[in-house]
């Protein structure tokens, strides 16, 4: 039987790594298939905290599926090809487990797709465990809980589904942690930005979206002090510009999210700033503007940008 590689998106966040780790376990232990969870980039500090807390060795980083000798892959926490492994079009996508929009995606063969509008891909993976009558091991439950906490900012994001609090409670019990205490510690681990270069900062959690012929890069960083991040605006803008030139982005939008007060500052550069301003009904001043109540790229930024670019 051929081996499957299971992975989340480029610039992996906690949910991308947790969901792929959990699904690979399900493939091996429940479905009896050879599957390995791998990652498309080095885990960030938040994810590293979760891995260390639950005693899990970080999955190895891969750059090419074909180079690994596999012909089939399973995607978690993404489906858009530009967010996936470099040679995604050269292998068969056997399954997708995701909670995002479907775009820039097609396959030659039928596949298993599980798409749910829930707070995290990890939520879907846990549901699959339950449906198969299996309780995930403590470390798997801990990672899945971490993925859900990360993506929903401890269930405060508008992306939180009505079923997610129960999922979180059950996973916390299996993992043996206090949901609030562990959740705050996890999120705090992801806000250490001072040690990051500007280039690293804008790449911590970044995705490219094809919007009406434009490649728009949308990145997000979590902080407890937006002003502290903006003190580095000049070097951050230089990094955004360099990344846009190197990769052909028409626009670069950075969400600087205050996880305590649930607001964001939008810092944006590019050739379509009129569309960015129209998307959020604000005026950029010195390339940035405040976006009250915004914490979710998926629900409060990308759909609005999509509408504005297609207008």
UniProtKB/Swiss-Prot annotation:
Mn(2+) 1 binds at residues 9, 13, 77. Its cofactor is Mn(2+). Mn(2+) 2 binds at residues 15, 77, 99, 151. SMART domains: DHHA2. Its main location: cytoplasm. Its EC number is 3.6.1.1. This is Probable manganese-dependent inorganic pyrophosphatase. GO terms for molecular function: inorganic diphosphate phosphatase activity; manganese ion binding. It holds the Pfam family DHH. It comes from Streptococcus suis (strain 05ZYH33). It is found in: Cytoplasm. Belongs to the PPase class C family. Keywords: Cytoplasm, Hydrolase, Manganese, Metal-binding. Binds 2 manganese ions per subunit. The keyword Oxidoreductase does not apply. It catalyses: diphosphate + H2O = 2 phosphate + H(+). InterPro entries: DDH_dom, DHH_sf, DHHA2, DHHA2_dom_sf, Mn-dep_inorganic_PyrPase, Oligoribo/pAp-PDE_c-di-AMP_PDE. Disulfide bonds: none annotated. GO terms for cellular component: cytoplasm.
């Amino acid at each position: 039987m051929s081996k499957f590689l299971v992975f989340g998106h480029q610039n992996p966040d906690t949910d991308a790594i947790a969901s792929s780790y959990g699904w690979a376990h399900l493939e091996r232990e429940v479905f009896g298939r050879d599957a390995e969870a791998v990652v498309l980039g080095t885990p960030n500090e938040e994810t590293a905290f979760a891995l260390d807390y639950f005693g899990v060795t970080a999955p190895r980083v891969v750059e090419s599926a074909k180079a690994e000798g596999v012909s089939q892959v399973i995607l978690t926490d993404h489906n858009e090809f530009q967010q996936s492994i470099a040679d995604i079009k050269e292998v068969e996508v056997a399954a997708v487990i995701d909670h995002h929009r479907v775009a820039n995606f097609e396959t030659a063969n039928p596949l298993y797709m599980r798409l749910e509008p829930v707070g995290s891909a990890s939520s879907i993976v846990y549901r699959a465990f339950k449906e198969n009558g299996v309780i995930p091991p403590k470390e798997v439950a801990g990672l899945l809980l971490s993925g859900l906490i990360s993506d929903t900012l401890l269930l405060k994001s508008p992306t939180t589904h009505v079923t997610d609090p129960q999922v979180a409670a059950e996973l916390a019990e299996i993992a043996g942690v206090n949901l609030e205490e562990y959740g705050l510690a996890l999120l705090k681990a992801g806000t250490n930005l001072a040690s990051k270069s500007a280039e690293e900062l804008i790449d911590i959690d970044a995705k490219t979206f094809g919007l009406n012929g434009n490649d728009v890069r949308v990145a997000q960083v979590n902080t407890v002090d937006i002003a502290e991040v903006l003190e580095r605006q000049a070097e951050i803008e230089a990094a955004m510009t360099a990344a846009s030139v190197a990769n052909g982005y028409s626009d670069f939008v950075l969400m600087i999210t205050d996880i305590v007060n649930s607001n964001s500052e939008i810092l944006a550069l590019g050739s379509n700033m009129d569309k960015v301003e129209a998307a959020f009904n604000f005026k950029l001043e010195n390339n940035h503007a405040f976006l009250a109540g915004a914490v979710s790229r998926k629900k409060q930024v990308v759909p609005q940008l999509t509408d504005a670019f297609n207008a």
